[in-house]
């Protein structure tokens, strides 16, 4: 029993009833098509040629329609071009004519309506006959091409009453899209024969070689409103109402695209582009918009407030020694930045400042981990470490090299600091449990918008003397190089001569990233971490007595800050300045990561100290809670995660190679640093400039694709505008070009005073007065002819002669009045050298102070 084919409806289309044909339906459709084609060939007879002048006796212009409108003249071009001429055309020519007249809609490789040669030629013959027949209707018949299309699609032969044949069709689309035009299209019967595959003679929807995704892709950008328009409705109708009322409310629309005309009005270019000239005001505006709390930040007197205000702190087992403090640190002044980027002044290691830093960095050790079997679990973690990261064959064939040469390099490096082979102590006679302590005078830039409520606390350094570090550093350096040589290919440690962040043949795009942020990393380490390091060092080949010795004096230690007079005992936490700091932090991070995540799911793994970054094709799977419950770490999985490690973004160029780019936000903050010492010849400023150039050597590799990547990563990480990052790159390009451009960012108050006091006018006169008195100022006695260095003037040959105020030794018999008069007369005004008006600029007048004379204006 044959069931009728399902009718076309939205419900049948959604539930899959429509469009699924059985083999019986396919055979029935093919037989019907064969019968229609045979009938068309049998019934077709070419019409006899008709002379237009004989068949139409009346004048074309005199022929009137019932409504009084003149009839449209018939074009001879289409009348004389009979249907028999189309029978002689090739298939390609017929396809061109079909596209010209019917204008089918192309969907992928399909046409709607489909091309049928017999139906197309029959439509042409019928259209020719209709144009020659007398007109009895008051409606305007379509032109020849539109009439052929109407006959072929079985639609209306006449134009609608609203628009005539010679009028321009109106765009009835609800959206004004340049280049697109939407024309009304009458409804058809809805039946279209399915396309047949030429290869397997099956319906194309059921053919295995039919690419349905290719059919969906060109239609993905089309919307519901492009195919249908609303008729006769008042108000806004939602999509649900439209879908439930398709029939009575909607009219099909035919969409076609034409080339957009060239605009006659040119759009003015945007003046705020990254390629425009960069000035200091633009860089400051970038800082103000990106770092809103940093632009008004000034900590010139913050430490004064700390020292003078009431202070309360809670520490256990702290020892204070206030008898031999260093009250003042000699300082010759620093360069003043023009940019205000929130950088702080250098911190002085006073007692209160050191106690505040110890409270944050060393005291209050968190206790987040659970109770575990330390010996058993530490061995398991070390075993997982070697399985995940180490190539066993390379480790077995590798050994220690360059230990002695590393020791010699270390001694040569610190030779200028007074370190020599004769000063090396006997380690067995030294108490290695005592560490020196200090705070970093330079505070790390803050990228969060919290400077208005939070004062950054400086970091601390716990270290041994250079004479002790020099005997452990060569061993750990050689061991670290061996460790790098034995790593698997996908593991990268971006430090040293062997490895870096440059990865050839690896693209960071289209990959999942995993970045773990470990807070309070140094002071959170305990005995469990120390045992893990001991097992790993023994496995890497470090001599067991040295490993045992090193771990023993890290179990309990005592730190002391001699400058601040503060001492405090500490236990297992990391010593931030000894020979094993970076190596130890790196292997601890790698061991924790291997226990929490399966390293085989990552294509690349990067580790550096407490920083880690992984790349994978699929979302990483692991348990990050073990960082807290097992390792006593405050861990945070960065979301959204971007390729960022060691304060650098990782970008890929067009060739699939990855390189590192320093964080633009931190580099802009470094442009406003206040730690550059002042010097007359700008040697310290030039050294800082060379460091800036070395960090930004990546600028030559930045293409537009890399700039777009950096903007996206910058916006994802900081939730700030990515366009600001592109503007920062323009500023970096300017200030790395030459040293003169970089000098615009800094000035000195000394130079300002020098420019104020350096002037030359022809009306200025100098009167010399003999004076042989001694001068005294700030408790230092000098003669007037004593030599001392003075800042160089702004004129060639102009040296300022600055004299010190001296005062003769007073006796008990002199009165106070005579002392004031003598002191007043001995004071002189410092004046610059005045050029003689009758000599050239190369000659100069000898300063009067060098002759032992006073100067008076």
UniProtKB/Swiss-Prot annotation:
All copies of the RdRp catalytic domain together span: 511-624
UniProt biased composition (Polar residues): 804-816, 824-840
Give the top-rank taxon of the lineage listed in the UniProt record for this protein.
Viruses
EC no.? Answer: 2.7.7.48
What are this entry's molecular-function GO terms? nucleotide binding; RNA binding; RNA-directed RNA polymerase activity
Its keywords, alphabetically, are: Nucleotide-binding, Nucleotidyltransferase, RNA-directed RNA polymerase, Transferase, Viral RNA replication
Provide the catalytic activity annotation: RNA(n) + a ribonucleoside 5'-triphosphate = RNA(n+1) + diphosphate
Q: What top-tier enzyme class does this entry carry?
A: transferase
Q: Where do the record's region annotations for Disordered lie?
A: 775-857
* UniProt-listed GO biological process terms: DNA-templated transcription; positive stranded viral RNA replication
Q: Which CDD domains match?
A: Bromoviridae_RdRp
Pfam families, A to Z = RdRP_2 (PF00978)
What is the stated purpose of this protein?
RNA-dependent RNA polymerase which replicates the viral genome composed of 3 RNA segments, RNA1, RNA2 and RNA3.
Family under the similarity heading? Belongs to the ssRNA positive-strand viruses RNA-directed RNA polymerase family.
Q: What do we know about how this protein assembles, alone or with others?
A: Interacts with replication protein 1a.
UniProt protein name: RNA-directed RNA polymerase 2a
Q: Which organism was this protein described from?
A: Cucumber mosaic virus (strain B) (CMV)
